[in-house]
Each structure stands twice: as structure tokens, then as C-alpha cells.
Curated annotation (Swiss-Prot):
GO cellular component: plasma membrane
Predominant location category: membrane
Entry keyword annotation includes GTP-binding: yes
Membrane topology value: Peripheral membrane protein
InterPro entries in alphabetical order: EF-4 (IPR006297), EFG_III/V (IPR035647), EFG_V-like (IPR000640), EFTu-like_2 (IPR004161), G_TR_CS (IPR031157), LepA_C_sf (IPR038363), LepA_CTD (IPR013842), LepA_IV (IPR035654)
Keyword match Protein biosynthesis: yes
Family statement drawn from the similarity comment of this UniProt entry: Belongs to the TRAFAC class translation factor GTPase superfamily. Classic translation factor GTPase family. LepA subfamily.
Protein task: Required for accurate and efficient protein synthesis under certain stress conditions. May act as a fidelity factor of the translation reaction, by catalyzing a one-codon backward translocation of tRNAs on improperly translocated ribosomes. Back-translocation proceeds from a post-translocation (POST) complex to a pre-translocation (PRE) complex, thus giving elongation factor G a second chance to translocate the tRNAs correctly. Binds to ribosomes in a GTP-dependent manner.
Gene Ontology biological process terms from the UniProt entry: positive regulation of translation
Name of the protein in question: Elongation factor 4
Catalytic activity: GTP + H2O = GDP + phosphate + H(+)
EC number(s) reported in the record: 3.6.5.n1
Species, as recorded: Pectobacterium carotovorum subsp. carotovorum (strain PC1)
Annotated keywords: Cell inner membrane, Cell membrane, GTP-binding, Hydrolase, Membrane, Nucleotide-binding, Protein biosynthesis
């Protein structure tokens, strides 16, 4: 046991976590030279295309240290994006230590801080590593000072390495073996294994990634899931050396995978505890706290025949991504679909792309909204995650919107631009601290503004130097209204949006203008209106296509022409009463961009 080291690699986006993992795998000989590829742990196509890590991956390697002993390293490569912070906290729960990788050129950024504090809260040993020292812009001494100033951990002897060229990586491993404590727990106690992650394999059923806290797990054991009480047979188990390798036993302190032929997707929930059926543990391990989704959107299959396969796909995906929430929803305009909850907009994009790619679905997304707290006149409190569920205006006593606490780190010269952006987003400054050339800003900004496009705008105003970390703070009373869209006097539920009263006129007008360009012309006039309650705030008309009925009149009496025009007018009027308008897919997407292009 004292030769096992479990650790995660945490860092901000693009500070070189996955490349460092590659080097560690190479040094320990986990893969042959031929099998080695860049970012070997980013196995999903999407991860490779976007160059980001989405899923945490685990690897078990043997490392011969300088003291001549062989250590077993179990490490987990984690994502750096704020939307996937839940993946990071789950990975950290399985470890005793973490490598905090910081780019020696860019220095400390917001996610570095957030992930590091998560690790320190869990009482993990944090080992700072300065990466990318081969860059001409690298300034390791300044960055080491920054780590001490901003993060507050001692970085005077931080290991310096370059994951790309491989310089200094052996020092990282030696420091790791020296500083990170071995796992606690005893092999003789009843088995307790924590499920860190699961995914669905079409042949094997549910595959779980587990960390053995106490006891040992053998092939063929009867395994009991503590929350459900179900008993399964441990058919296969083993480790990843990135490749799946079968073993007969997983010892105390190890991280490995387990297949129990579970067909039911909810059979082994993430964060649950496994134990032996014949000698069960007294109590379950503390799991993970459930994360609350911050952004909700409706997902609907384009053809209603896909509904069943869409439901199965969501089930399989939610097994792999525990932060995804979904419930059935129906809409008059779009038919049957699901209301899904995500941690942020990037998370939403990734989920939609994974559903479309891995499960061959065509989906329509409605505009993302956040959760509002509504106090009705009957003194009830309801939580509303979709504009169509909002009670009528005269039944609402008070509407509260979620406020996010945003921590930003940015170079001094961009401070003015960023403050202007925050004020425009209805933000309130709560703190500002200078660390050398960096400024740490704390703002309270409404969640609805943060999830819409705040991150993109922050990056563009600061030329990519500012970094952001946000978390839900509280609900606060606010003057929000629902803007409905009426097409030919019929409300289209999928196009409604909730916005602040100050912006509502302007948002309504913008939405109506956008719709006008997107709805194809018909044989009759189409009126597009935006309304708050019964009060119309904007209108535009898609003009009808009409035939020139006077072409056949050559000269002739004016009353003859009037008769023909009147006849055409009556015909169009009848047509308008029975005609209905097909809305194109782009019309639903237009609402996503309302308020974006205007600045």
C-alpha cells in the first residue's frame, strides 16, 4: 500500500495537463512508442477537434523511482473548463494529492485558483508544477511568486518542466512520490469502493471506474450496490494503462474498472459505494454533492419518430455525465422532447454535439434560460426553468433571478474595458485586489447574463487574457418580464424569453426584426408581434406574395379594376383565416442570438 500514489492533474485550460500526462505515460512505459499519440487521453473526437479535455480519464502506471523502488501511480487527467468543474471534483475525491500545473508564460488564472481551492478543501496535498519553461516568454520566477501571492501555497521549490520537450518531467515524478501521501485504509476491513465514473458499453453494459477505499475486490465476487441494495456478479475487473487490462484482483487504494453486466442505466449511480454481499460494510462512503444545473434548454428531435432513441441516448449519456439533468417536455410548436439542465453553455454545446454524433440524432434547441424563483400571490414559492412555465403576471408577487459570483483575473491594462462590460451586464462590484501586474476582480452578475455570452465577450474585450470562474450565489428580487412572440395572433411557446424590463422593449424589437427575415413569405400577410402580457411592444409584417390581377385589363373602366382587386383581397382574407405558418429551424435559433450582435 505504501507504494501506491493516487493523484489528479489540475490546471487552467491550455496550461498543458494532457501533454504532461502523455509524458508521464511515456516515461513509465504505459504505451509503446508506436501507440503513443499527442494527447493520448483525449479519446473523444470532440475533444481532439476542440483541443479541450471533457471527460476525466484515469491511468495506472508503474514507476521506478530514484530510490530504486517501484511505485504504482494512479492518475486522473481532468478538464480545465469551468463548465466541467464537476468532473474535476469527482476525480479529486479519488485521490490523495494533485499536481497543480501552471503555464510559466501566462501565470495563475481563475480556473487554476478554483480547482486548487477545491483540492485544498478536500485536504489534498497540492504539488505546484511550472510547465512550458521552453517558451521564450516563460518567466518561472515571476510565476512562482504569483502562485504564492494569489493561491497562497509555497512555490519556491516548484518543479520546473516542459511537458512538450520532456525536460524536467522525471523530477515531477520524483517530487510526486516524495510529497503525496500513500492511500489510507486497510485491506482487512469490509470492502468499500467508490464509483467515480461510469459509461455504457453496448456489449458489456455499465462499466464503472472505482477507487477501492477499504478491503479488496476479486473477480467473481458478489458485489452489492449500497444505495439500491442490488447484488451483481463482478465479471471482469482491471486497470487502464491507457489500454483496458484485465486483472483478477483490485487491492486497497487502487483505482480500476469493473464490469458487472448491469443492464439498467441507473444500476450503479456515480458517487455510490460498492461492498461485498456476504460481508457488507456498515456505512456508505460520503459521495459527491449533487451539482445543480445552471442553464436549462429544451431539446427536441426534428422528426417525432426519433423520440424513443433520443430518450435512450440521453439515458446513456447521463450515466457518463452525472451533471446532466433531463425531464420530458412537450411544446405545441415542436412536439415531444426533453427539458435538459446543463452547467453552462459550453456544456450544452458539447452535449448536443455528442448526441448528434454518437447517436445520429437531429435536434432543435430552444433558447437557454436559467432558473427563476417565483413567489406567487398565494405565497407559494415555485422554481421556473422555462418561460412557458412562468405563471401569469397578475399571479406573481415577486420574481427573483439567480445571481452568480464571478471571479476574474486579468492584466491591469484591460481593467477599464472589463469593468465597462460588467456594468453593462448589470453587475455589482464586490471586491478588487491587485497582485503585481494582475488584478483579481469579484463581481455579482445575474446568471442569465453570464450564461448568455459573458465569457466570449470577456475574452474579446481582454484579448483572451482575462479568465473567469463563476458560481451560484443567491436569488435576488428583480424586475423580470416574459416577452411572448405572437405569429398571426397565436403565441409560439418555444419563442418566449424572460428578460429584464429595461431591456425588454429593445429585445422584443430585435427578436421581431430577426423573425421577419427568417420566416418565408406566404400568400397572405404574416403579423409578427412581441408582447408583455397583453401589451404589444413591437410588430413587423412579412408581406404577402400576390399576383398582378390587373395585367389582363387593357385600359377599361376603373370600377372593373376595383372589382378585381377587391376579389383578390377577399380571397387573401379567407386564406389568412385558415392558413398556418411553418416556422423554419433558424427561427428558433435566432432567439439564441438576441442581445448578442447589438454591441
Amino acid at each position: 500500500m505504501k507504494h501506491i500514489r493516487n493523484f489528479s492533474i489540475i490546471a487552467h485550460i491550455d496550461h498543458g495537463k494532457s501533454t504532461l500526462s502523455d509524458r508521464i505515460i511515456q516515461i513509465c512505459g504505459g504505451l509503446t512508442e508506436r501507440e503513443m499519440a499527442a494527447q493520448v487521453l483525449d479519446s473523444m473526437d470532440l475533444e481532439r477537434e476542440r483541443g479541450i479535455t471533457i471527460k476525466a480519464q484515469s491511468v495506472t502506471l508503474d514507476y521506478k523511482a530514484q530510490d530504486g523502488q517501484t511505485y504504482q501511480l494512479n492518475f486522473i487527467d481532468t478538464p480545465g473548463h469551468v463548465d466541467f468543474s464537476y468532473e474535476v471534483s469527482r476525480s479529486l475525491a479519488a485521490c490523495e494529492g494533485a499536481l497543480l500545473v501552471v503555464d510559466a508564460g501566462q501565470g495563475v488564472e481563475a480556473q487554476t485558483l478554483a480547482n486548487c481551492y477545491t483540492a485544498l478543501d478536500m485536504n489534498l496535498e497540492v504539488v505546484p508544477v511550472l510547465n512550458k519553461i521552453d517558451l521564450p516568454a516563460a518567466d518561472p520566477d515571476r510565476v512562482a511568486q504569483e502562485i504564492e501571492d494569489i493561491v497562497g501555497i509555497d512555490a519556491t521549490d516548484a518543479v520546473r518542466c516542459s511537458a512538450k520537450t520532456g525536460i524536467g518531467v522525471p523530477d515531477v515524478l520524483d517530487r510526486l512520490v516524495r510529497d503525496i501521501p500513500p492511500p489510507e485504509g486497510s485491506p482487512d476491513e469490509p470492502l468499500q469502493a467508490l464509483i467515480i465514473d461510469s459509461w455504457f458499453d453496448n456489449y458489456l453494459g455499465v462499466v464503472s471506474l472505482v477507487r477501492i477505499k477499504n478491503g479488496t475486490m476479486r473477480k467473481g465476487d458478489k458485489i452489492k450496490v449500497m444505495s439500491t441494495g442490488q447484488v451483481y456478479n463482478a465479471d471482469r475487473l482491471g486497470i487502464f494503462t491507457p489500454k483496458q487490462i484485465d486483472r483478477d484482483v483490485l487491492n486497497c487504494g487502487e483505482v480500476g474498472w469493473l464490469v458487472c453486466a448491469i443492464k439498467d442505466i441507473l444500476g450503479a449511480p456515480v458517487g455510490d459505494t460498492l461492498t461485498l454481499a456476504r460481508q457488507p460494510a456498515e456505512k456508505a462512503l460520503p459521495g459527491f454533492k449533487k451539482v445543480k444545473p445552471q442553464v436549462y434548454a429544451g431539446l427536441f428531435p426534428i422528426s417525432s419518430d426519433d423520440y424513443e432513441s433520443f430518450r435512450d441516448a440521453l439515458g446513456k449519456l447521463s450515466l457518463n455525465d452525472a451533471s446532466l439533468f433531463y425531464e420530458p417536455e412537450s411544446s405545441t410548436a415542436l412536439g415531444f422532447g426533453f427539458r435538459c439542465g446543463f452547467l453552462g453553455l459550453l456544456h450544452m454545446e458539447i452535449i448536443q454535439e455528442r448526441l448528434e454524433r454518437e447517436y445520429d440524432l437531429d435536434l432543435i434547441t430552444t433558447a437557454p434560460t436559467v432558473v427563476y424563483e417565483v413567489e406567487t400571490t398565494a405565497k407559494e414559492t415555485v422554481y421556473v426553468d422555462s418561460p412557458s412555465k412562468l405563471p401569469p403576471l397578475n399571479n406573481i408577487q415577486e420574481l427573483r433571478e439567480p445571481i452568480a459570483e464571478c471571479h476574474m483575473l486579468l492584466p491591469q491594462e484591460y481593467l477599464g474595458n472589463v469593468i465597462t462590460l460588467c456594468i453593462e451586464k448589470r453587475g455589482v462590484q464586490t471586491n478588487m485586489v491587485y497582485h503585481g501586474n494582475q488584478v483579481a476582480l469579484t463581481y455579482e452578475i445575474p446568471m442569465a447574463e453570464v450564461v448568455l455570452d459573458f465569457f466570449d465577450r470577456l475574452k474579446s474585450t481582454s484579448r483572451g487574457y482575462a479568465s473567469l470562474d463563476y458560481s451560484f450565489k443567491r436569488f435576488q428580487t428583480s424586475d423580470m418580464v416574459r416577452v411572448d412572440v405572437l405569429i398571426n395572433n397565436e403565441r409560439v411557446d418555444a419563442l418566449a424569453l424572460i428578460t429584464h424590463r429595461d431591456n425588454s422593449q429593445y429585445r422584443g424589437r430585435e427578436l421581431v426584426e430577426k423573425m421577419k427575415d427568417l420566416i418565408p413569405r406566404q400568400q397572405f400577410d404574416i403579423a409578427i408581434q412581441a408582447a408583455i402580457g397583453n401589451h404589444i411592444i413591437a410588430r413587423s409584417t412579412v408581406k404577402q406574395l400576390r399576383k398582378n390581377v390587373l395585367a389582363k385589363c387593357y385600359g377599361g373602366d376603373v370600377s372593373r379594376k376595383k372589382k378585381l382587386l377587391q376579389k383578390q383581397k377577399d380571397g387573401k382574407k379567407r386564406m389568412k383565416q385558415v392558413g398556418n405558418v411553418e416556422l423554419p429551424q433558424e427561427a428558433f435559433l435566432a432567439i439564441l442570438h438576441v442581445g448578442k450582435d447589438s454591441k
